[in-house]
């Protein structure tokens, strides 16, 4: 059978929260089969399982909330776990926010690969899309469609000089594209004016040119420029992959986003789960039964 995965060993890192600016200790630990991804607040001795229903705030990031306990900015770490096929993991945090690291999923990919990956004696579960599902909010929309693989496309639309030279749309079919090489390094981005307003409201206190692409009225301020020509839209794809992993399983289907964000992504997940005829949970006995997007080596 195609088995679930967890980490071989625990691994620790230190960073700062993007919005709080607080120092955060992060430890990724192996978890038993069928546990899922569980965030544990070591400062409060409380835990929250990563599920679509646990999302309680999506204004600036994806935030899990349960009985007043919060864990925010989970999407980059979840994207890395999804990209590496990790089904079960304890995420221990000393504060309320996952550290922003360099603003991408790449540091989390490095941590997981350094800890090692092991298979477990339980079948890996997939969610297969059977019927189209869509959520529309004005000129923004998100949709799932049936697809025998995993494909994510996204369109952004910003009225700003920097984006005139940018690819506004990207599509990633993971049967032929490496998450690690082509998506994981895309950093979060923000506009200087918005960052100044956020800081005035005591938010984005940990943000800097070391962990985000910052854009002023005319240009990218980071001296090293962009990691990909289409890094802005690639980061939206990275975010979406993390948000979609709140299904608790790898997805067999395609996702399309147009000018959407964390809120619409979560609304789409909830709508999908409400429509039981639109999806099914599946497992696979043999590797050659898997959609090609999932039979690639982890190190690709």
From Swiss-Prot:
Its cofactor is Zn(2+). GO terms for cellular component: membrane. GO terms for molecular function: metal ion binding; UDP-3-O-acyl-N-acetylglucosamine deacetylase activity. It catalyses: a UDP-3-O-[(3R)-3-hydroxyacyl]-N-acetyl-alpha-D-glucosamine + H2O = a UDP-3-O-[(3R)-3-hydroxyacyl]-alpha-D-glucosamine + acetate. One of its GO terms (biological process) is lipid A biosynthetic process. Its EC number is 3.5.1.108. It comes from the Bacteria. It is an enzyme of class 3 (hydrolase). Keywords: Hydrolase, Lipid A biosynthesis, Lipid biosynthesis, Lipid metabolism, Metal-binding, Zinc. HAMAP family: LpxC. Belongs to the LpxC family. Catalyzes the hydrolysis of UDP-3-O-myristoyl-N-acetylglucosamine to form UDP-3-O-myristoylglucosamine and acetate, the committed step in lipid A biosynthesis. This is UDP-3-O-acyl-N-acetylglucosamine deacetylase. It comes from Halorhodospira halophila (strain DSM 244 / SL1). The lineage of its organism: Bacteria, Pseudomonadati, Pseudomonadota, Gammaproteobacteria, Chromatiales. The gene is lpxC.
């Amino acid at each position: 059978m195609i088995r679930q995965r967890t980490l071989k060993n625990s691994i620790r890192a230190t960073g700062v929260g993007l919005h709080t600016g607080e120092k955060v200790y992060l430890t990724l630990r192996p978890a038993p089969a069928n546990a899922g991804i569980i965030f544990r607040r070591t400062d409060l001795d409380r835990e929250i399982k990563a599920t679509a229903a646990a999302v309680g705030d999506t204004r600036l990031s994806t935030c899990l909330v349960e009985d007043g306990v919060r864990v925010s900015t989970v999407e980059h770490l979840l994207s890395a776990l999804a990209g590496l096929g990790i089904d079960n993991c304890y995420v221990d945090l000393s504060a309320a926010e996952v550290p922003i690291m360099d603003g991408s999923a790449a540091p989390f990919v490095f941590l997981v690969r350094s800890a090692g990956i092991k298979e477990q004696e339980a079948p890996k579960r997939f969610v297969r899309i059977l019927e189209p599902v869509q959520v529309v909010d004005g000129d923004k929309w998100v949709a799932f469609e049936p697809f025998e693989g995993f494909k994510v496309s996204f369109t952004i639309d910003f009225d700003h000089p920097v984006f005139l030279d940018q690819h506004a749309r990207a599509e990633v079919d993971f049967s032929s594209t490496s998450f690690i090489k082509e998506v994981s390094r895309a950093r979060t981005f923000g506009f200087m004016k918005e960052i100044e307003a956020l800081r005035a409201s005591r938010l984005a206190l940990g943000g800097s040119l070391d962990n985000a692409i910052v854009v002023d009225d005319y240009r990218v301020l980071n001296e090293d420029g962009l990691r990909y020509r289409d890094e802005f839209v690639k980061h939206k794809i990275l975010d979406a992959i993390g948000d979609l992993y709140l299904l608790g399983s790898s997805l067999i289907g395609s996702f399309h986003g147009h000018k959407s964000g964390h809120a619409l992504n979560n609304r789409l997940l909830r709508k999908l789960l409400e429509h039981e005829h639109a999806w099914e949970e599946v497992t696979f006995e043999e590797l050659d039964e898997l959609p090609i997007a999932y039979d690639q080596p982890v190190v690709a």
